[in-house]
Amino acid sequence: MKLTTVLALSLMLTASAFSQSTSSELKELKDAIAAQQQQIQQLQQQVQSRDSAIQQLQQQVGQAQSAANQAQSTAQSALGGEKKEGAMSAEEFAGLQHEVTDLKAVTANTVDGLQDTQKRVSDLESPLALHFKGITLTPGGFIAAETVWRPHATFSDINTPLNSIPFSGAAQARFSEFYGSGRQSRLSMLAQGKWGTTNLAGYFETDFLGVGTTSNNNQSNSYVMRQRQIWGQAGFHNGWTVTGGQMWSLVTETKKGLDNRTEATPLQIDAQYTAGFSWARQYGFRVTKNWHNKVWLGMSVENAQTLLTASGNPTNFLIGGPGTGAGLYNLNANYSSNASPDYVLKVAFEPGFGHYEVFGIASDFRTRIYPNATLAKPTAAGAFNNSIWGGGFGGNARWLFYQKHFETGIHYLGGKGIGRYGNSGLPDVTVDPNGYQKALPANQVLASLEWHSPKWDFYGYGGGEYVGRTWYGTKPGGLGPVGYGSPLFNNTGCGTETLPTASNGYGPGALANCTGQTKSVVEGTTGFWYKPYNGPKGRLQIGMQYSYLVRTAWVGYGPLVTVNPPPANPGSATLAPKAIENMWFTSFRYYLP
């Protein structure tokens, strides 16, 4: 009985202690929750106080404006009415005018205060830039995940080499290709500051479309960052602006005056843009003048380069060489030895409806000629330099309709020696039998249609590039044609597949008996961008593109002519090879805010 009593008392004491402990823990938990709720309420009160202050300022603005309007009305009535007994005296009228002036000043100050408050709130919630030592830094760019599918392989990732899509006889034309890539991801930084009345700016932009010596798709898919743009700028209050560095060429169309960073580039995914788009990114030193945001005049000196294509020519000329190991140029690329930079002059107009541009290009092409290179005993004696000038004229026009939702534009560039400014990279020059350069006639045209809305962008482009032929029937020694686009060149093998050239499976055979020099490249492109989110946290963007591309070569003849003189009429056995690509692209991007 005693044992039972002891056990009962023990259980009661334990239960009591447990109950007290549990009650204590519950009380502490309730106190913590209450404290958190109090903090939340305080934060809510702060937000409500801020909103209330803004509303009060808005009400004050409305009241002040109403009072100012009423006082102004009274003053006007007093001024225009007839003087009657008890009417307002001159002193009273002057006092009323003074009151109106004071009310207007109060209204202006209140509006400024409201705008300043709203701006500070916006800057705190969503800062658009960083401030560092008196300058403003604005980061930008996007992260991209993109794919491309082509029915005929080009081995070129997310950009399409328009002048290299394969003819039907090429092995790569017999199978398709799919690639995924994040290399078009882009990073940029804009730095801005003021020096007195002068606006200073610097801009840097990069992507990952460069190729290193160890880059491949085997495992890590590591590709290198490259320079897209890097320039500095000084803008003066009198409308003059000076810009220097690597930038879009002044040839490239802009959407606002001649301002950098307003270039009218196609919206598509393909990193090589579209046929007919004229552009370059290269060193430039540019000076522009702005008259009242209506007329702009710009002039730039830019890096020069010569693109040459010639067939059948002897080795009696020189225009440059490959990069050297001790220098900073690519060992696998050719560089022309330029006598001078390229010169571009442009005028832009914005009369009130539309944006219009007229421009011209001038290029100096230099050659080292060896007149005795074709003798029975060749010698470099008597070699000399020779230069020719090339260039052209172009124009752009762009219009906005339907509350700026619908945008359309047209571009044209024509001349001689302007091939490299076209998107397809067609040649600038060829050579005659004696080694003299001859500038090739060329034309580039592009039409664009775009539809813009907060959620959707739709686009369509149609363009083409053409390069004329310049050829000569014989070369020193009396055999074969020389130049570009000759109907006597052999194109009979452009549709015949050849055997691989390597045993490792990565050596597609080169076409035999296929000169295949390009006459024109024509492309039609359409696509869309969808933006499920576009706000202070950035922009999410999804897109798709389809392109139809046709590359047509100059008519040729085969086999190679070995008689002198060559036949005046190549006959009915002429061949104009054609290559066609149907391409699909997809893109998933996140843009920095």
Name every feature range the model reports, one short phrase each:
Residues 2-9:
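Sec-dependent signal peptide recognition
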Residues 15-19:
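Sec/Tat signal peptide C-region and signal peptidase I cleavage site
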Residues 20-156, 499, 506:
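N-terminal periplasmic/intermembrane-space "pro-region" immediately following the signal or transit peptide
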Residues 125-313, 337-355, 399-409, 414, ...:
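Outer membrane beta-barrel
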Residues 153-157, 214-223, 255-262, 309-335, ...:
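Outer-membrane beta-barrel translocator domains and adjoining extracellular loop/strand segments
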Residues 176-182, 222-224, 275-279, 335-340, ...:
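Short sequence motifs at beta-strands and strand-loop junctions characteristic
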Residues 351-524:
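Detector for outer-membrane/organellar transmembrane beta-barrel domains
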Residues 578-593:
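Outer-membrane beta-barrel "beta-signal"
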